[in-house]
Amino acid sequence: MSPQIRVNKMGWRISTHSERSTNTDLMEGPTPRHSLLSGRYKQSFAYLTLRSRMPGIMQQVIMRVVNDLPMLEEKFGEEVRKDVKQIVDAIERLKMELNRDRQFLQFHGNEPDKAEWNAFLSELPRPKRTFFRACWLHAECYLYRRIFSFFENSRFLHNFDCFDHLKQEDLIISEETMKILAKATRDLPKTFDNFHKLLRINLWCNHFEIQLGAFTFTEEEPQNDINVLAKVADIDRVLLVNDSVLVWNCLMKPGPNGIVDYICDNGGFEFFADMVLLEYMVDNNLATQVRLHVKAIPWYISDLTRPDVEWTINYLVHHEDECLSALGKKWARLISSEKIVIAPVSHFWTGPQPYFVMVESDIELYRVLTNSRLAIFKGDLNYRKLMGDYIWDSAEEFITCLRGFRPTNICAMRTVKCEVVCGLPEGMADTLLRNDHTWMISGSYGVIQYTDSLKCSCAFPGEENNIKSEHWPALVQPRSGRSTGAQTPIG
Ligand SMILES: O=P(O)(O)OC[C@H]1O[C@](O)(CO)[C@@H](O)[C@@H]1O
């Protein structure tokens, strides 16, 4: 087969040549309903990712370090060549393991989360320990974890983020959009309507081309008023579930605790849009504090890490545009006054596990979340982990698919980029499929889903229920069903 070139979401050119698979266990057809996503199914996005996208991404990592070699030599001296060679060799080996569908290997280096990973890998049933036979979530997370381990175990490059330039470029090329959004969102009054618009802007920024097209304006159009926000109405025709009212009502309820946990997704422009929303929330007392949960290591190309947060704020503070620079300074103040904080980094977010096991596998993190008013999970990967990477009936209720994971009230905001979805009206998924067979991977459709927690019945394993319901009067509610969309915003 002749090589084909496609451009991935970060603009990388990826060769999609296929080599012969030695895997005899693959199945024709798409992933069946009520199964885990997996590279076993040849008509799935998981298969395409493992067969074509991941080798391409690994090739790009190789090119990045090789191209950076002169700069690295200048910084670290000639000895860094040895690191680069070892990293390149290790990535080539990993490509080969993936191509031959080899068993996952244990971690033996300096990885701080190696014990958790090794325990997880050895508990997987043997037939589910190879790239194409495993659940896609396990295989994909394992690949990103292995890639960073090569850097982590090197002498000079243990902090090297091989994706940082992509996140930075994404922000830099979004300058015009950032200016418009910044101007349009200064001093917005506290209304549901404004919150709703900001939520939708934020959602659509998870669809990666947004910064290039969605908010472009002609010269004659006003660039600094609320009409800019009204533009989002044009692009949310394809919002399949919209629980924004429930999210607003959750934040508006009186109660002692107004912390919001924000489980971040991508850096670059998406993080800028996240901050616009979060700034609005703290400025208007919709949250007393926001805790950003970022990734401990470079992850899924564009995911946000602590250095990305620092770089972004610093970039804005020193921007020549006055409005962006003022915004950067304001956000720096929100961070130094701890209105917005970076939560202690947890390796659970860069583990392979779905969120319903968090209570058993990372009780500390689970406890942190129980201590907040609302946890917002942003993006497709977080959604997959909430759903357990499982093909539910598309009309199944969000609350059911969480499989008991309800440390606090939960909101998921994501554009649909893989075959996992729930909470849709009966028949909608079939209609969408008839009209557009790529609807589940295009990122063109979105969901904002919400469910409240049942604090009063929540106990940690081996403990009495230690969360007293009287501490949560406003949050103790009957189980919520699927949202009807007919709710009225408080206030
Ligand atoms: O940035 P997001 O929204 O989490 O998207 C990442 C997702 O995109 C993909 O690359 C394609 O679905 C998946 O690997 C992953 O779930």
Where are the predicted features?
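Conserved structured core elements
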Residues: L48, L137, V241, F271-M275, ...
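Structural motif
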Residues: I259-D261, R373-L374
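Gly/Ser/Thr-rich loops at beta-strand to alpha-helix junctions
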Residues: A134-H138, I263-F272, I297-W299, D380-K385
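Short, flexible loop/turn elements at secondary-structure junctions
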Residues: I147, C264-G268, A296, R414-K417
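Residues at the starts of beta-strands that form the adenosine-phosphate
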Residues: I259, A287-R291, N409
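Non-catalytic accessory regions outside enzyme or core folds
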Residues: S2-I259, S444, Q449-G491
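Histidine-anchored nucleotide/phosphate-binding helix
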Residues: F269-R291
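C-terminal functional extensions of proteins
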Residues: P3-S38, V294-A296, D303-G491
